[in-house]
Amino acid sequence: MTNLRKTHPLMKIINSSFIDLPAPSNISSWWNFGSLLGICLIVQILTGLFLAMHYTSDTMTAFSSVTHICRDVNYGWLIRYLHANGASMFFICLFLHVGRGLYYGSYMFLETWNIGVLLLFAVMATAFMGYVLPWGQMSFWGATVITNLLSAIPYIGSDLVEWIWGGFSVDKATLTRFFAFHFILPFIIAALAGVHLLFLHETGSNNPSGLCSDADKIPFHPYYTIKDILGVLLLILVLTSLVLFSPDLLGDPDNYTPANPLNTPPHIKPEWYFLFAYAILRSIPNKLGGVLALVLSILVLAVVPFLHTSKQRSMMFRPFSQCLFWILVADLLTLTWIGGQPVEHPFIIIGQLASILYFLLILVLMPITSLFENNLLKW
């Protein structure tokens, strides 16, 4: 008798995706982050659902409803901090996942990569709107500053901002719609992640060598299910340690002050995972130029496959490209640090240099270095 998991219409989809999936025998722990992102998304949707049961999206009661969740709801504090720090873990996994894709040339799977870039935008939009919901000082002013950037768009800018606000300032209408979008977007992200997987399974996974692995495949279960469980346990360990020992480590103290439109915080800054993009935005004195640079800082990822000039897919055997890759990582860490600093000397010039280097590395230096390495192969 044929196994039910291979014949049942629903079970065979799960079987071909997570059980009998042929996977390369040599994929390292860098390939764990896809499953970790899935776990993060599930954690965020579940904790978010329970938070939404107690949250009120009204400017008068939003802040106190979050306080009520933390003080009066059974384990409300745990759910709230799991959700807030779960977002940080989500972004750590995202950045490592994208970094893996850049290093090993996974971007050559065009459809999978482009849906991944779309997913990155969707997750960033969701996180931004989620940060507005507690209605603290940084929530309010973050929303004001970031939505105001759209006014830089020629001709339609100011109308567009008022349309998003639902009035002439960030107010009740803005909070209500942000809550609605913040609730629906994770489900759109889950659907996109399904499409992301669908396209990935059309081609099969890449591997560290970047070579075709069709001759050497192993079943996903039990080999990679066990390997993924180790990653999940480590993720849970880090997340619970963060939540139980230092829940406010990555947050902003200003967000424990209720939103006040008449009092601007001395330093308006987003959550840590947006600081690199915020630094790029601030490094350009022109408003429209800054907005374009902000969007391009993520959108540049979509261009990477077309700038692949190397004869080898992975960076595993390309030491010069490896050097540039790690310079890029250091540059992004520098931008993250600069994004959290005040706009004054020497941070302004450091941010500008780091922003120039970021685009220069991806668009110019890496493709040229790849061509140079191609010539080295002839020696």
UniProtKB/Swiss-Prot annotation:
It comes from the Eukaryota. PROSITE patterns: CYTB_CTER (PS51003), CYTB_NTER (PS51002). GO terms for biological process: mitochondrial electron transport, ubiquinol to cytochrome c. A ubiquinone binds at residue 201. Binds 2 heme b groups non-covalently. Heme b b566 binds at residues 97, 196. The chain crosses the membrane at residues 33-53, 77-98, 113-133, 178-198, 226-246, 288-308, 320-340, 347-367. GO terms for cellular component: mitochondrial inner membrane; respiratory chain complex III. GO terms for molecular function: metal ion binding; ubiquinol-cytochrome-c reductase activity. It is a multi-pass membrane protein. Its cofactor is heme b. Its main location: mitochondrion. Keywords: Electron transport, Heme, Iron, Membrane, Metal-binding, Mitochondrion, Mitochondrion inner membrane, Respiratory chain, Transmembrane, Transmembrane helix, Transport, Ubiquinone. Belongs to the cytochrome b family. Heme 1 (or BL or b562) is low-potential and absorbs at about 562 nm, and heme 2 (or BH or b566) is high-potential and absorbs at about 566 nm. Component of the ubiquinol-cytochrome c reductase complex (complex III or cytochrome b-c1 complex) that is part of the mitochondrial respiratory chain. The b-c1 complex mediates electron transfer from ubiquinol to cytochrome c. Contributes to the generation of a proton gradient across the mitochondrial membrane that is then used for ATP synthesis. This is Cytochrome b. The lineage of its organism: Eukaryota, Metazoa, Chordata, Craniata, Vertebrata.
